[in-house]
C-alpha cells in the first residue's frame, strides 16, 4: 500500500522511482555496467584507505585527507547504487518512505562533506607549497582532525536541513519520482504542501557550501600557481605541479557536474540529461578518484609497488 489516510492528509509509505529507462534490454546493460563500476569504486577506495594506513611514507596530512575522501566516496556511491541495481531487476521500482529519507540524507551528507574535503585538500596544498617552513605547524595533527571534524559537522548540518524539510512535506499522490533516487528537487515537485521556504533555505545552504568551498579552492590554487611560477628549479616546479594535478582533476570533475545541475538554468537541459549527469557525479566520479590519485601521484605509486613487491616475493 502506497498511502495511509489520516484525517484530511495522506501519509505516504512508499515512492515509485521511474529510474533511467523502461527498456528491459537496456536495463540489463546498465545493470552490468553500473555493477562493475560499483565494485571498482568500493575496491579502489578501500585499497586507497588500506594503502595509506599501512604505508608509513604516506602518513602525511594530504593522504590523511585523501583517506577520508575515499571513505566518503564509498558512502556517496553506496547511498544510491545498491538500490539502483536492485531496481534494474524488477518491473516496479519502489522505495519506502524511510528508505527515501535515508537515501536523501546520506547523499546530501556525503556530497557536502566531499565539497569541504576538496577545499581542505586545496588549503593543504597551499600551505605545503606556499609556506613549506610553517607547514608542519599549520597542518599539525590537531589542525587536521579539526578540519575533518568540521567537514563532517558541515555535512551533517546541511543534510539535516534537507531531511527535516522532507519530513514536513505532505504528498497527495501519485508519488512517482522522475529520477533513479530520492533527490530533493523531484520530491519538492511532488509535494502538495507549501515548499517555498524549504526551497529557499536548502538552496541557500547548498549554494553557500558550494560557493565558499569553490572560493577556497580558487584562492588556494591562485597562490599556488604564483608560487610555482616564481620557482627557479625546474625539478621543484615539476614536483609541485605533480602533487596538484590529481587534486585539480578531481575538483574539476566534481564541481563541473555540480555546476551543470545546480547552477545552470533548468530550462537549458532536460530531466534525462539531469539523470545522466547525476549518475556521473554520484556513481562514476567516486570510481575515478582513486584512479586519478594513484595514477598521477608518484608517492602512492611507489608505496603500491613496494607493498606489491613484498607480497610477491614474501
Curated annotation (Swiss-Prot):
- Topology in membrane: Multi-pass membrane protein
Q: Which residues form a coiled coil?
A: none
GO biological process terms held by the UniProt record: G protein-coupled receptor signaling pathway; sensory perception of smell
Compartments where located: Cell membrane
Keyword Membrane on entry? yes
Instruction: Give one GO molecular function term.
Output: G protein-coupled receptor activity
Q: What is one Pfam family matched by this protein? A: 7tm_4
Spell out which residues lie on the membrane's Extracellular side: 1-28, 79-102, 158-199, 262-274
Q: What are the transmembrane regions?
A: 29-49, 58-78, 103-123, 137-157, 200-220, 241-261, 275-295
Q: Name one GO cellular component term.
A: plasma membrane
Q: Which UniProt keywords apply?
A: Cell membrane, Disulfide bond, G-protein coupled receptor, Glycoprotein, Membrane, Olfaction, Receptor, Sensory transduction, Transducer, Transmembrane, Transmembrane helix
Spell out where the chain is glycosylated: 8
Q: List the disulfide bonds.
A: 100-192
| Family designation | Belongs to the G-protein coupled receptor 1 family.
Role of this protein: Potential odorant receptor.
Q: What is this protein called?
A: Olfactory receptor 5P68
- The source organism is Mus musculus
**Lineage of source species:** Eukaryota, Metazoa, Chordata, Craniata, Vertebrata
